[in-house]
Amino acid sequence: MSPTTPADQAKKLIKVPEMRRIKHIYFVGIGGAGMCGIAEVLKNQGYKVSGSDIKASKTTAHLEQKGIKVYIGHTADNLKAVDVLVVSTAIDPENPEVKAAIENRIPVVRRAEMLGELMRYRHGIAVAGTHGKTTTTSLLTTMLAEENMDPTYVIGGLLNRTGVNAALGASRFIVAEADESDASFLYLQPMAAIITNVDADHMDTYGGSFDKLKDTFVEFIHRLPFYGLAVVCGDDHNVREIMPRFGRPTLTYGFNEDNDIRAVDVVQEGMQSHFTVLRKDREPLRLTVNQPGLHNILNALAAIGVATDEGVSDAAIARALEGFSGVGRRFQVQGEFELGEGSVKLVDDYGHHPKEVEATIKAARQSHPDRRLVMMFQPHRFSRTRDCFDDFVEVLSQVDQLLLLEVYPAGEKPIVGADSRTLARSIRLRGDVEPILVDPVEGNLPNIIQKVLQPNDLLLTQGAGNVGAISVDLAQQQLYLK
């Protein structure tokens, strides 16, 4: 008998036993950040996987290289001997593939429900919170990997260390982001959970009620078994408010003295942050995280809390943090190009909520104190722009120069008073910065950039839409005309 490989062991270990009747899994919108990772993991487990997307992309090309058939465009003819259809909340119920599946009695499940099935028979670790999920999930995954625990992981961004956002590991561990945007994280049944923070976002899901949002986070913690573990940010007021209702073993982390896991003696130098972590019954541990910003120290503390509980050594934690190469579009340095007697440094970041944008601005100021900060910001969703309008005005006024793109709709219809022109007017009236409206479609971006940028600027492209592609083009000097 030939010896089994780690891949063979992983397939036997993680394949869901109760899904034995399922052979062919089809993903509608397979190129989405939350979909492609699950699709790839299922393919690696031995299922037949196919799917469709509205357009070709690097992600769909990657999936096809892995042997996953991807159709461009949605049509009922794509469904060939499919056993289950996986959709995200972004998919219209009138989608022809969804309608065909319903007509043919093919089960239609949400992506989080499928992720929940992957987690059901494993030691699942779910990372929830309004901000910081992707980086925290990536840090924890890296710590487990450094201890040779070989976890399966599903992340909302590309882990720079591996170049992918999901992988099938040979161990019982699975680490995944838990998405509160549509309350679908309630499908998960993890053994350990992290809550990084709780803020008002995706309020349409919760009927505009912040209390309902907080109630749902409590319900998420109740998905843990009574012997599970919740690791939550004790510095976050909203998390502290709901903690008494958890009813599960809980550890808090943060900078404040009343936390179980604390960071002290913080020193920030360039693109690195140094701190000492204090934990109960442990010696103080001096660490360096290869990321700037206090928010990334908090992300590291969350990962340390779970990693320590799972048996990861201090040495592995230290190696993981110091060697952490980041996540795609999370304060990602895209490069530099020469300008005059200096250069312009390009950084790209996915943050799209006012608190995320503010954390990125602080990290940029701390890591590059001698550079002028020029931000190219693309608001994401009209509803978020409406709900967080005043906060956006305040935060975006903190940069030295602001280039403002139109709102990326993400499938939403325009909302009166929630567009970039109105946002620019309010920022201008505040008087701290003079915003410049930019429309890349009109082809005026190169000329505007030429006029705005100065030697030794830091240009930060910010947002969850397609603004990141501009940073890539700039790094390749396709948009900057000398």
Curated annotation (Swiss-Prot):
EC code(s) of this entry: 6.3.2.8
Spans traversing the lipid bilayer: none
Top-level taxon of origin: Bacteria
Cysteine disulfide links: none
GO molecular function term, any single one: ATP binding
Keyword terms, alphabetized: ATP-binding, Cell cycle, Cell division, Cell shape, Cell wall biogenesis/degradation, Cytoplasm, Ligase, Nucleotide-binding, Peptidoglycan synthesis
GO biological process: cell division; cell wall organization; peptidoglycan biosynthetic process; regulation of cell shape
Compartmental location: Cytoplasm
The reaction(s) this protein catalyses: UDP-N-acetyl-alpha-D-muramate + L-alanine + ATP = UDP-N-acetyl-alpha-D-muramoyl-L-alanine + ADP + phosphate + H(+)
Enzyme class: ligase
UniProt pathway: Cell wall biogenesis; peptidoglycan biosynthesis
GO CC field: cytoplasm
Binding site for ATP: 129-135
InterPro entries on file: Mur-like_cat_sf, Mur_ligase_C, Mur_ligase_C_dom_sf, Mur_ligase_cen, Mur_ligase_N, MurCDEF_pg_biosynth, UDP-N-AcMur_Ala_ligase_MurC
Family statement: Belongs to the MurCDEF family.
Function, as annotated: Cell wall formation.
Entry-linked PANTHER family: UDP-N-ACETYLMURAMATE--L-ALANINE LIGASE (PTHR43445:SF3), UDP-N-ACETYLMURAMATE--L-ALANINE LIGASE-RELATED (PTHR43445)
Protein name as annotated: UDP-N-acetylmuramate--L-alanine ligase
Gene behind this protein: murC
